[in-house]
Amino acid sequence: MSPPLLKLGAVLSTMAMISNWMSQTLPSLVGLNTTRLSTPDTLTQISPKEGWQVYSSAQDPDGRCICTVVAPEQNLCSRDAKSRQLRQLLEKVQNMSQSIEVLNLRTQRDFQYVLKMETQMKGLKAKFRQIEDDRKTLMTKHFQELKEKMDELLPLIPVLEQYKTDAKLITQFKEEIRNLSAVLTGIQEEIGAYDYEELHQRVLSLETRLRDCMKKLTCGKLMKITGPVTVKTSGTRFGAWMTDPLASEKNNRVWYMDSYTNNKIVREYKSIADFVSGAESRTYNLPFKWAGTNHVVYNGSLYFNKYQSNIIIKYSFDMGRVLAQRSLEYAGFHNVYPYTWGGFSDIDLMADEIGLWAVYATNQNAGNIVISQLNQDTLEVMKSWSTGYPKRSAGESFMICGTLYVTNSHLTGAKVYYSYSTKTSTYEYTDIPFHNQYFHISMLDYNARDRALYAWNNGHQVLFNVTLFHIIKTEDDT
């Protein structure tokens, strides 16, 4: 392998790369995960001074990449001797705290006895003085009174004995606290720069760097499709549901369009949770009926094919009106060049990391698929690519990073069979199977924000995960 190629690293990333890393890798970072991975392909040290290391190409049994970060050897969060020592010290402190609480209650009780005894002793002292001053008149009743006073003082004896015991216990507590303080001081000095607060800051910093890295991994080649996850079961056999790939992180609205014809109603939900529960937030009545199920929401607007025409409509949800419409020249419509399942699926509108696209077929291209990149504002065709794949032989298709992926069927046993790169204007035949759980797919679209495939499968709204293959250049590579 040539030196320049040695500077290239291959990384497999799933649509849930960040969430998987946060849920699986951060626990290992702080010593809460002891899972052993297979030997990694590459080992890169992030910071020699810090001692952090990252495995960048380990694979789990499912073939997914797991970015594993190994903390320095002086990892305070691991279950080492220091952790056990701290737990033992904590138990001691808790036991001492309980004992001191009991001692405090007992002392308060005994103090009341002492106050009472003090009053009685003062009375006894006065009685002795009276006897001493009046020895001649000493009578039997004086001795009886003296005996009664002495009897009242008898309970003071066990109280004073308890005070002596408590005094010893307090002395013992003082010694234990002194030893505990010395141990904690030693641990604090040993911890030094590797305290929990700094470790927490390092984790946050590493998370930020990983997110920055993720932004650079927006494009890649499709390697695998996993799932599906069934989100909801609703509607007819055919329809579309989608989210906006350009929406902010806080904007998780879902749009729902049931059926492939004779409908103008779009239902909006504020979140996936509301969609699942059926809590609509708004309903839109479009000015035109749509054709097919291959609509797309992009940057706050709905793009759809007008019924019985090759006209594309741009409808703004915020403004509630049509912003643009344009005929897609030579594009077949009304089941002239649909996908294998029919349903007026002649014109497929889609979006990816690069922009807005239209996939269709023309007589000029012998019914084979044509890919056109559209201007999202004017709907003008900016550039087109003619492929050799018959549109009527395709089950569905979707765009990822400027590459069109075509399935060979909408039924059971479907797989991604063909791909065409608009970057290189080349095609290849592929073999990427996926699970058609409900036997009839009428909508399959990629969402670049979620890095997932949204599908309508025989009245079920489902999601597929995608695994992409990336080539990453090092900073030194020019």
Curated annotation (Swiss-Prot):
Disulfide bonds join 219-401. Glycans are attached at residues 33, 95, 179, 299, 465. It comes from the Eukaryota. Residues 77-217 form a coiled coil. In the eye, expressed in trabecular meshwork and neural retina; in non-ocular tissues, expressed in brain and lung. GO terms for biological process: eye photoreceptor cell development; signal transduction. Residues 1-23 form the signal peptide. It is found in: Secreted; Synapse. InterPro entries: Noelin_dom, Olfac-like_dom, Olfactomedin-like_domain, Quino_amine_DH_bsu. It holds the Pfam family Noelin-1. Residues 218-470 form the Olfactomedin-like domain. The keyword Hydrolase does not apply. GO terms for cellular component: AMPA glutamate receptor complex; extracellular space; Golgi apparatus; synapse. Keywords: Coiled coil, Disulfide bond, Glycoprotein, Secreted, Signal, Synapse. Peripherally associated with AMPAR complex. AMPAR complex consists of an inner core made of 4 pore-forming GluA/GRIA proteins (GRIA1, GRIA2, GRIA3 and GRIA4) and 4 major auxiliary subunits arranged in a twofold symmetry. One of the two pairs of distinct binding sites is occupied either by CNIH2, CNIH3 or CACNG2, CACNG3. The other harbors CACNG2, CACNG3, CACNG4, CACNG8 or GSG1L. This inner core of AMPAR complex is complemented by outer core constituents binding directly to the GluA/GRIA proteins at sites distinct from the interaction sites of the inner core constituents. This is Noelin-3. It comes from Homo sapiens (Human). The lineage of its organism: Eukaryota, Metazoa, Chordata, Craniata, Vertebrata.
